[in-house]
Amino acid sequence: MLVLYGHSTQDVPETNARVVGGTEARRNSWPSQISLQYLSGGKWYHTCGGTLIRQNWVMTAAHCVDRTMTFRVVIGEHNLSQNDGTEQSASVQKIVVHPYWNSNDVSAGYDIALLRLAQKVTLNSYVQLGVLPQEGAILANNSPCYITGWGLTKTNGQLAQVLQQAYLPTVDYAICSSSSYWGSIVKKSMVCAGGDGIRSGCQGDSGGPLHCSVNGKYTVHGVTSFVSSLGCNVSRKPTVFTRVSAYITWINNVIASN
């Protein structure tokens, strides 16, 4: 059984991840990170992260846009509660969810969506495109990565106001799919990272990037998907990400045809 936006006593995946055990990111040090926000009662609220991949396209998790809402993207953001002077916002004009996504079964994979913005954002030192990996690229076990987001800073806690980052080394598929970790819930189309019981993603980080250092350059290898419903930072339950390198062709095709 899988839980979306809820809690269960069983150890099942729960979407909505956020950063636990992290530190405040240096201002605008992750310039492809976006805040996905929804409109409610005349105010905008952060719900998920995402990555700017073209000037008018954002990559996020499918489960972030399951519900019909008015969304906008804010980029160049650092502190959600104040105007940093570097932000740009754009309304979401079109949402393209992966055709195989099933909101009742996040463990099947395909937790990825692309958002076309109503206008192009301007690139500058605060706003940059995320670099995506090559199709099929698989990271070695214990590769150095960082998760970033404004998600909860502890299980059942509060959203972070300033962007957080946490070091989450990858856990390869052989280990992550073993019975003492996630078992068969994790698929080859996913990336696992963390699992030390201290640092993790948590609610509100979902859809955001896993930045991995490859040849000295940060590449977005993951889209934050789910954590254990027992808590965000559970030992041997790494944060699970959609593996971006499994979807490069799909991403390029969607952008080309829209």
Swiss-Prot record:
Cofactor comment: Binds 1 Ca(2+) ion per subunit.
Keyword Hydrolase in record: yes
Glycosylation sites: N79, N233
CDD domains: Tryp_SPc (cd00190)
EC top class named in words: hydrolase
Catalytic reactions on record: Hydrolysis of proteins, including elastin. Preferential cleavage: Ala-|-Xaa
Record domain Peptidase S1: where: 19-256
Gene3D superfamilies in the cross-refs: Trypsin-like serine proteases
GO MF annotations, alphabetized: metal ion binding; serine-type endopeptidase activity
Principal localisation: secreted
N-terminal signal peptide: 1-8
Disulfide bonds: C48-C64, C145-C212, C176-C192, C202-C232
Protein origin, superkingdom: Eukaryota
Positions of the propeptide segment: 9-18
Family named by the database record: Belongs to the peptidase S1 family. Elastase subfamily.
Biological role: Serine proteases that hydrolyze many proteins in addition to elastin.
Identification of the protein by name: Chymotrypsin-like elastase family member 1
